[in-house]
Each structure stands twice: as C-alpha cells, then as structure tokens.
Amino acid sequence: MNHKSLVLAVFAAAMASACTSAGHGAAVSRSASAAPAARLTQSHPCAGIAGFVCSTLTVPLDHSGHTPGTLDLQVAAADNVNAPRGVLLFLTGGPGQPGVPFVPRIANRIAPVLKDYRLVMIDQRGTGQFGAINCPALQAAVGSSDITVPPPRSVQDCANIIGPGRRFYSTADTVADMDMLRQALGVQKMVVDGVSYGTFVAEHYALANPAHVSKLVLDSVAPHADPGHTDAFYLVGLRAVGSVLRAACQVKPACAFDPASDVAWLVRHGGDGVRIFDMLVTYEFIDPTYRNPNPARVPRGFGDVIDALHAARLGQPAHLDQLIQGLNEGGDSPSQFSAGLHAATLCTDMRFPWGSGAVPVPQRMPALVMATAKLAANQVWPFDAKTAADDGFVQTCLNWPLTPPAPEASPTSKLPAVPTLILAGDRDLSTPLAWAQEEAASAPLAKLVIVHGASHSIQTREPGDQGRQALYSFLPG
C-alpha cells in the first residue's frame, strides 16, 4: 500500500474526500414538475448501520421531463420517524462523494442532536455503491482530487462513457432530487447541513426552496455564486497557502523562516506549482498543524510539510518529493468517490475563462491564454499564473465536450433569511476561510464560527469541539 492509499484510507474513515473543495459557478434548481410521485421504496434495515432504514428514491434523469430515464438513489434515514424537531438532511462533499457509507461517522460525531432530529443521508446522483459513474482512466488518474491534472484523453473518454446525459449531473439536478427526497419523507421543512461541496448544494437548495428550509448549517464553505468567474483558477485557495502556512509557523516554537517565500521560490525555480498545491490541499487532512513530523495513521516521519518545503529550498528535496508522490496520485474506487461525476458536475456548473461548457472546445484555449496573461502576481502568490491555469478544474473542463451549462446563481443573490450557522477552520486550504466570510456576508441570518487550528470539515474532523458545540447550541434554538 503506497502513501496515497494509506492516506485515503484515513480520509474515508474520517469523512474526508481528499479534496472536496467545491468547485462552484453555480446552479439553481431545475423544475421538478415532470417528476413522478416522490416516494421511498425497497425499504430495509441498512446493513451494518443499526437504527437506520435504507431505501431507494427514484428520480427523473431530466427533471424537465424532456429526456426519458430515471436514476435510483440510495437513502439512509434514522428510524426515529417522529423526531420532535424533524429531519436533518446531511449532505457530503465532492462532488462525487456518497452519503450513506458515512452515516455511522456522522451519527457518532453529532450524536447529541439526534435525539431531537431524524438524520437522513443520500447518495447523490452519480455517486455511491449502486449509482457511481465509473470512468476508469479518469478515476485512476485523479481519484478524488480537484487539482490533479488528468490526461485529456481520459476526460474525453469519460464524457463519452456518460454520453449526452452528462448534462443532467449538475447541482441544479441534485437540488431537484433533494426536494423529491423531502416530499418522500413527508415533511414541509428540514434542516439542511452540508460539508464542503455539500454546502453548495445546501445553499442552492435554500435559494430554490426557501419555504422548505428551517435552518442551514454550512461547514467548510463553497460560496453559492462566482461573480468574477475566477473560481476555476482557485485563486482564493492559492493565496490562502501563504497565510495558512505563515500562521502555522507562528505557533511556538516559531519558524525561523517564511514558508510562503519557500513555496514562491520553489515554484519559480523549477518546482511544479500544481503538484505542490495539490499536495498541500491533501496534506491538511492528515495534519492541520502542517508541522507535525508524525501525524497519526501515516508512516513515521511522513509529516511536517513546512520543514519539507524549506529543506527543498535549501537543496534537499527528498522529503518534499516523498510527500508529492505519496499524496498526489489517484486511486479511489468510484463508489468511494466518483471522478466521473465530479467532472460532469463541475464542467456543467462552473464558468471558465472561455465561458461555459457550451463554448466549442477549439475556442477555449485562446481564451484561457488571454485570461492567464491578465492574472496579476498578487492574485496567485505564492504561486504563479501558470499554476492557476494548469489546475485540475481548468484542465478537465478545457477538454470536456460541448455540454449545455446549468444556470448560474445571480452574482448579487443572497441566501434566504433562515437561521444559518457557518463553520470554518482557519487552516483550511480546500475551502479557505475567505469563502466562509464571503458567504456569511450573503446570509442575512448567519452566525460565523471560526475554529482556530482546524482545517476542513469541522463537524467530523475538528481536533477539539468548538464547532460541534456551536452546532449543538444552534440546532435546538
């Protein structure tokens, strides 16, 4: 088992989808007027999950009804049907991560609220044991990474495997599925709790169905809109590397060097910016301090990425090379994380330097070159413009065939006036703190809780309990 496989095993146990930073551009709900009656079928006790019933929710492939076909989505619901405060729908990340396998982990981590709420989780369309899109070459190349660059042929092959139906794997389609789930559960309102990409789905569900949301919990936030159409460049994440690593170095004993300058030097002296960034975004899942030489459940001496970066700048790259090799490879199975669904959703939802997926492929590269040339140094530092242009978001969708785009959220749209708890770790590179602050400004009834020293996925992975205590206080009120 190589380091990547070992780390991914840790992530699966900890509900980390080794880069579930949500690409977003964004999507609003499709009409579900043509949908069949929403109901849960084939109900049975969930295998290995005591107290939960697993069922099938059948949804239209195309919620407008113009294209025939259905999809079967697996749902797990707690058996406390008459929970006094109703349903808590918990949405996992990606896009590409299933929900049902994480029920035991989530139920354990937020157990104090589940005496009052009925926990429900779902394998979103294109994910999970029974519905994952399987694109073998793309899966092998990128696994669950947003940032790893796939071979162009693997992208094209994946789009062909999915076929014309790839247009129906947008966030808008998932939002329509979620409202069918609400109807099938027989509730008028529910708490919607999302992590990472799950926050994006939750935000868009609330925008499309404000009357059906009692509260929102947004953990490790992807904002619901991208007014500047720059999120494909991952500019906020690139810039966050400098501030996050510097903050980590200020913890005693303080570093005697500047880790952000080390990254900048390496990128400008032959280092592969994309692979370094990809590694750092993955590394946060095993060590939010960025300085622990021996993080739990990985080989001894594997950690302390800050030291590895500094050593590489001083001419000793072996440790950094080990980290890059160990953390930047693909390898997840589709049922753990569907790279095909990930690509289909992002390339339909997002907007790029060339526009949307409706722009012919030959016209995209010239537009990308022009946009990259306009990037200022302070937009990408400590990285460079090439890193921004070469990341997995851009390079995947650069080669994705013509696909009608999902509609965007208005750049000036606000979340509805429902109580909203926003949880953010100040060490998060996947969904940086700046995104949480941006979304808090767009939510009229938001409470932002910043957990210092924590990285991604506060409810399930925070070392302490500040975020969960905030959740426990927020939900009963």
Q: What does each model-found stretch correspond to?
A:
Residues 28, 35-279, 283, 292, ...:
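Gly/Pro-rich cap/lid or specificity-loop segments adjacent to the active site
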Residues 7-14:
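Sec-dependent N-terminal signal peptides
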Residues 1-7:
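Bacterial N-terminal signal peptides that target proteins for export
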Residues 322-355, 364-370:
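Long, low-complexity segments enriched in small/aliphatic residues
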